[in-house]
Regions:
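Solvent-exposed serine/threonine-rich low-complexity stretches and specific carbohydrate-binding patches
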Residues: 63-76, 81-83, 205-219, 247-254
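Ser/Thr-rich low-complexity repeats and stalk/linker segments
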Residues: 26-114
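Short glycine/proline/serine/threonine-rich loop/turn segments at secondary-structure transition edges
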Residues: 87-93, 179, 272-278
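Acidic/polar low-complexity flexible segments
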Residues: 113-127, 195-216, 270-325
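Carbohydrate-interacting/catalytic domains
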Residues: 1-32
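Glycine-centered loop-to-beta-strand initiation motif
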Residues: 72-80, 168, 258-264
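Exposed aromatic-hydrophobic patches
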Residues: 2-4, 77-85, 263-269
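Surface-exposed, glycine/proline- and aromatic-rich loop segments on solvent-exposed faces
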Residues: 119-124, 128, 138-229, 289-294
């Protein structure tokens, strides 16, 4: 068993020398009590044992920078509450250990999965066949990969909440994987803008799309996703030619091709840990992306949208501005 703390963005190469050494137990008296297999909600109560008065670090998924300090009482018992709000994917098994930075040893790991309890807060059905841009004249590129697929035609947007975390489901007329995209969909890019309640600042500019947000909306967070990227931005530094300030963590992404639905998962941490999402606004549009939002020209082409000038809005289909109850 190897236990080693490494600085962020570092790596270690090990070469076996051929010698064998028996594995011995590590961690001394450090123990974490059994955890539930599945955690629902935004917190997890964690308890265990250590030497009386000993201060250790409780580490989730190997992230020492965000470790919580725990100190055992006179009886060698400790207890703390671990935030699970940022854990969005129920398929992932999360790992918790106690770490002794003095002795550089870790306890036996405990694992659990985190499952959100989502409630629907918004749903809007979008007209079929309105994927022709703000002018009504935009045409898909002529390559048959688009053809009758209409990957940019939004049919429904459904928003769910769990605390201040969000799940945004976008159902399209079709989802294709013709180009073997890493994210499970191609021939379309989705761009979403979120305005936070009670937050100053923001921007009306839709970076790189030659347009502004409708209805006077000003965004604080922006999501841009296509088959090979999934990026999350703050409005700081955003201009017509600058997407804003990249942020982490970003959105989780899941594609259900059978249901023609792309889902985005945003933790409360990604949204700045707001006390409430009541009054927040969401706007979403489609286009496509190829080293930038795909080109537009009056005549169009195999890989170029047609029906507009290069300076026209790069918006194929779009939602209204949706306001959270």
């Amino acid at each position: 068993m190897l236990t080693l703390a490494l600085p962020g963005r570092s790596a270690l190469v090990l070469i076996a020398d051929g010698d064998r050494t028996p594995i011995t137990a590590t961690g001394g008296g450090m123990r974490i009590a059994a955890l539930p297999e599945t955690v629902r909600g935004d917190t997890l109560s964690v308890a265990g044992t250590a030497a009386p008065g000993q201060t250790l670090q409780l580490v989730l998924d190997g992230d020492l920078a965000q470790a919580s300090a725990v100190t055992a009482d006179a009886g060698g018992q400790w207890q703390t509450t671990l935030s699970t709000d940022a854990l969005m994917d129920a398929a992932i098994a999360h790992r918790v250990v106690l770490w002794d930075p003095v002795a550089a040893v870790a306890s036996e790991a405990r694992t659990f999965r985190a499952e959100k309890t989502w409630r629907e807060v918004l749903r809007i059905d979008d007209p079929v066949g309105d994927d022709h841009g703000r002018s009504g004249r935009i045409r898909y590129p002529q390559d048959p990969g688009w053809g009758d697929n209409h990957q940019g035609d939004i049919e429904r947007i459904t928003v769910y909440q769990a605390g201040s975390a969000l799940k945004i489901d976008v159902r399209l007329r079709s989802i294709t994987g013709i180009w073997n995209p890493a994210n499970g969909f191609d021939h379309v890019a989705l761009t979403a803008f979120i305005a936070m309640p009670g937050k100053d600042g923001g921007s009306r500019i839709m970076p790189l799309q030659n347009a502004e947000l409708p209805e006077g909306m000003q965004w604080h967070y922006r999501l841009r996703a296509h088959g090979w990227s999934n990026a999350w931005f703050d409005a700081k530094l955003a201009t017509a030619v600058n997407e804003g300030t990249p942020l982490s963590p970003g959105a989780g992404l899941h594609v259900d091709a059978d249901q023609r639905t792309i889902s985005f998962l945003l933790s409360a941490e990604a949204l700045g840990n707001p006390e409430s999402m009541s009054g927040a606004k969401l706007y979403l549009n489609t286009w496509d992306y190829d080293a930038g939002y795909r080109k537009l020209s009056p005549e169009g082409g195999n890989m170029v949208f047609g029906g507009g000038n290069s300076t026209d809005a790069k918006v194929l289909d779009e939602s209204a501005v949706l306001i959270f109850p």
